């Protein structure tokens, strides 16, 4: 007689060892009430159980080979390998105990049922240990070799995905942590995780003064994705610092427009022909907004980089929308560009009101040609986004509203 025990569903959450045991008994007609049939069934069941034992042995040999290969490819330390081999020997002993439990039942399913349950539990542990070491085999090479910044961030992104996968695996099967080899690898993972977080955060903060960026660079996207996976709070801190720094720099740049040299101010106030002073003032205004446009371009780059990061799927379409939805994050539902120009506009409005009281002669220069003011501001905002914008663009409306004090006053 030939019986084939079905191991195909050992990974499924609805695996039913009792049903498997019943299937064995039914296959040998052990449910008959006739004594003669019971004797025949016992003999048939004996053959069936021997076949199950043979299949158990085959599984052990196959999984031991697979697991050892995984470990050999991922670990160089001989002590690790010896430890794994010791664990495999222990598993073999467990299987021997299971085999000894597989006895021919006379009246009930108890011994066979218990044996199959133990078989399932042990085999699950063996299988997921193999999966865990397979993850480690992919993880270790990502920290080796000298590479450039973008390639390193790409590797850190892959490593973060694997660390997440490892965490999920251990949360589903926490008993694996009792294996000393797993504990050693977890300590190494903690070290690598800290390294990734530290270096990725340093990269993000280094972008604070980076005004040249490649259109094809995924470094910023990968860095944000990595911190989203490993430390969301630190990612929020870093982005808050970056945006606050850019806003402060833009405010300082705008304030510098109205810081006139003594010569220019003397020409503006005392000269019968203030054209020279006016020319200098307009030049400072144009240059100031050009510098602001470069800062705005950086915000646009960050915004688009976050839009490309879809690591937060399916909860959010991309990281930009994730941050927009966070109740305690500075964006408060706005895009990065809108937030940048809104904060800048608040400072501009305050500055304009102060100058209107203290330096009306300086503002008279801009009031004389408000159309030129509008053109310079709109072009600066357009330049920051590399898109054609008009007076209906929200960013333009926000900024121009803060400059309304420069508009000619109706008589």
Curated annotation (Swiss-Prot):
- Chief localisation class: cytoplasm
What are the record's GO terms for cellular component? cytosol; Golgi apparatus; Golgi membrane; Golgi transport complex
The record's Gene Ontology biological-process terms are:
intra-Golgi vesicle-mediated transport; intracellular protein transport
Quote the subcellular location field of this record: Cytoplasm; Golgi apparatus membrane
Membrane topology for this entry? Peripheral membrane protein
Taxonomy, superkingdom? Eukaryota
Q: Name one Pfam family in it.
A: COG5_C
Sorted UniProt keywords: Cytoplasm, Golgi apparatus, Membrane, Protein transport, Transport
* Keyword Protein transport annotated: yes
Q: Which InterPro entries match?
A: Cog5, COG5_helical, COG5_N
The record's disulfide annotation reads none
Q: How does it assemble?
A: Component of the conserved oligomeric Golgi (COG) complex which consists of eight different proteins cog1-cog8.
The family note in this entry says: Belongs to the COG5 family.
Protein task: Acts as essential component of the peripheral membrane COG complex that is involved in intra-Golgi protein trafficking. COG is located at the cis-Golgi, and regulates tethering of retrograde intra-Golgi vesicles and possibly a number of other membrane trafficking events.
Stated name of the protein: Conserved oligomeric Golgi complex subunit 5
Q: Which organism is it from?
A: Schizosaccharomyces pombe (strain 972 / ATCC 24843) (Fission yeast)
């Amino acid at each position: 007689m030939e019986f084939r025990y079905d191991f195909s569903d050992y990974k499924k959450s609805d695996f039913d060892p009792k049903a498997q045991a019943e299937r064995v008994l039914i296959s040998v007609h052990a449910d008959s009430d006739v004594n003669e049939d019971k004797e025949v069934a016992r003999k048939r069941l004996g053959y069936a159980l021997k076949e199950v034992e043979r299949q158990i042995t085959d599984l052990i040999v196959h999984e031991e080979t697979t697991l050892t290969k995984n470990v050999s490819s991922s670990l160089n330390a001989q002590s690790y390998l010896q430890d794994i081999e010791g664990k495999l020997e222990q598993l073999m002993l467990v299987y021997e105990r299971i085999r000894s439990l597989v006895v021919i039942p006379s009246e009930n399913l108890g011994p066979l049922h218990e044996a199959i349950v133990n078989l399932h539990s042990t085999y699950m542990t063996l299988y997921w240990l193999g999966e865990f070491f397979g993850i480690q085999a992919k993880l270790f090479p990502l920290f080796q070799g000298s590479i450039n910044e973008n390639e390193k961030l790409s590797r850190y992104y892959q490593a973060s995905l694997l660390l997440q996968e490892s965490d999920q695996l251990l949360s589903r099967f926490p008993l694996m942590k009792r294996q000393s080899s797993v504990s050693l690898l977890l300590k190494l993972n903690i070290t690598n995780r800290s390294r990734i977080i530290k270096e990725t955060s340093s990269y993000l903060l280094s972008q604070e003064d980076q005004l040249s960026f490649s259109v094809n660079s995924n470094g910023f996207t990968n860095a944000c994705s990595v911190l989203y996976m490993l430390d969301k709070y630190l990612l929020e801190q870093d982005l808050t610092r970056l945006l606050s720094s850019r806003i402060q720099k833009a405010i300082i740049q705008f304030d510098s427009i109205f810081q006139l040299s003594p010569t220019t101010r003397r020409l503006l106030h005392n000269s019968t022909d203030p054209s020279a002073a006016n020319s200098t003032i307009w030049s400072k205004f144009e240059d100031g907004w050009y510098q602001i446009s470069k800062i705005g371009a950086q915000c646009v780059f960050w915004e688009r980089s976050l839009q490309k990061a879809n690591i937060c799927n399916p909860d959010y379409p991309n990281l930009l929308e994730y941050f927009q939805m966070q109740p305690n994050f500075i964006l408060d539902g706005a895009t990065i560009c809108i937030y940048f120009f809104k904060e800048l506009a608040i400072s501009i409005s305050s500055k304009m009101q102060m100058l209107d009281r203290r330096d009306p002669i300086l503002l008279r220069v801009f009031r004389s040609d408000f159309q030129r003011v509008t053109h310079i501001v709109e072009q600066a905002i357009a330049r920051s986004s590399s898109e054609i914008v008009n007076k209906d663009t929200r960013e333009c409306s926000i900024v121009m509203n803060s400059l309304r004090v420069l508009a000619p006053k109706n008589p």
